[in-house]
């Protein structure tokens, strides 16, 4: 369960070809072991949609199908047992096609994540607000939510993404004041492991620190396991999660007489496997 006061869950996305079931399952297993709680898989082909069924049999966390453009892929993924679908109603096509997706979701009570992105904001909203803005993103998201609500379905999650950290923060402040739907939070296209982790820590810290957000993803250009490590650290730093060992260590100076950097790195690796402990370890 997400939203409604439930704990914030950590999400990632596979970068394997979903059609390659063995590779995808292997990656999901590694992510789950690292602490991933929801996994999203790209579904660009009918073969990928059909692979969802076999993937579901072999993993232990909810699977989300990421759909673009072809509404039939969303339907096929749901027919193959996916737990949630992510769509942008604006690129699915006509209202009839959106309704076809909503009807299947309604029949199976499958949540729909409605996603909007600053990189694809509608031209009329860009013109209305004089550029890509937080206000435009929120209006776009709520317009798409209303389309689905008008089809008598409200099992929805909203996602507003931007690579502009402060725009993303502002958009979440605005939309959280306008709706009670669960929000998936992340800074999209944030960069490589170092840069992306820092941008995500700033953005997610500002958003989650206001009590906004129900699921998170730290989007990185790198090994998805690094996304989980960063997300867990962000949640622990904010005091949202208490499990795991926190390492504090001296930044070193001219008085340092041992290999403190190497020692701190070794301790951090050793401590990573003790999620059940809530400790602070000092390396000085």
Each language-model region and where it sits:
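N-terminal amphipathic alpha-helix/helix-capping segment at the start of soluble metabolic enzymes
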Residues: 1-13, 106, 263-269
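Glycine-rich phosphate-binding active-site loops on the catalytic face of alpha/beta enzymes
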Residues: 35-37, 80-95, 187, 210-224
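Glycine-enriched alpha-helix->loop->beta-strand junction motifs that scaffold or abut catalytic
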Residues: 35, 58-61, 78-85, 106-108, ...
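Glycine-rich, proline-tolerant flexible connector loops at the mouths of alpha/beta enzymes
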Residues: 12-21, 32-58, 86-94, 155-165
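Alpha-helix-loop-beta-strand connector modules within alpha/beta enzyme cores
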Residues: 45-67, 100-112, 174-183, 265-272
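Hydrophobic or amphipathic alpha-helical targeting/insertion segments
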Residues: 72-113
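Catalytic alpha/beta core domains of metabolic enzymes, predominantly
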Residues: 117, 125-282
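Active-site mouth loops of central-metabolism enzymes
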Residues: 4-23, 42, 61-69, 90, ...
């Amino acid at each position: 369960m997400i939203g409604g006061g439930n704990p914030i869950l950590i999400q990632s996305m596979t970068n394997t070809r979903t059609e390659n079931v063995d590779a995808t399952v292997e990656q999901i297993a590694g992510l789950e072991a690292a602490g991933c709680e929801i996994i999203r898989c790209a579904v660009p082909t009918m073969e990928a949609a059909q692979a969802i069924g076999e993937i579901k049999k072999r993993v232990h966390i909810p699977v989300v199908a990421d759909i673009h453009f072809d509404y039939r892929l969303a339907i096929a993924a749901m027919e193959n047992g996916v737990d949630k679908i992510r769509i942008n109603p604006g690129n699915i096509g006509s209202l009839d096609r959106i309704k076809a997706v909503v009807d299947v979701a309604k029949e199976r009570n499958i949540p729909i994540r409605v996603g909007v992105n600053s990189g694809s904001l509608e031209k009329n909203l860009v013109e209305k607000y004089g550029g890509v803005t937080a206000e435009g993103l929120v209006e776009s998201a709520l317009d798409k939510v209303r389309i689905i609500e008008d089809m008598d379905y409200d099992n929805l999650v909203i996602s507003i993404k931007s690579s502009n950290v402060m725009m993303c923060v502002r958009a979440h402040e605005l939309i959280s004041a306008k709706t009670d739907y669960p929000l998936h939070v992340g800074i999209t296209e944030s960069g490589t492991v170092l840069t992306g982790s820092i941008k995500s820590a700033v953005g997610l810290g500002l958003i989650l620190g206001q009590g906004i957000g129900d699921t998170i993803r730290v989007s990185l250009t790198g090994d998805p396991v690094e996304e989980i490590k960063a997300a867990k650290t962000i949640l622990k730093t904010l005091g949202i999660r208490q499990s795991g060992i926190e390492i504090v260590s001296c930044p070193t100076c001219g008085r340092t007489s041992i290999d403190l950097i190497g020692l701190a790195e070794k301790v951090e690796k050793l401590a990573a496997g003790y999620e059940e402990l809530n400790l602070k370890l000092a390396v000085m």
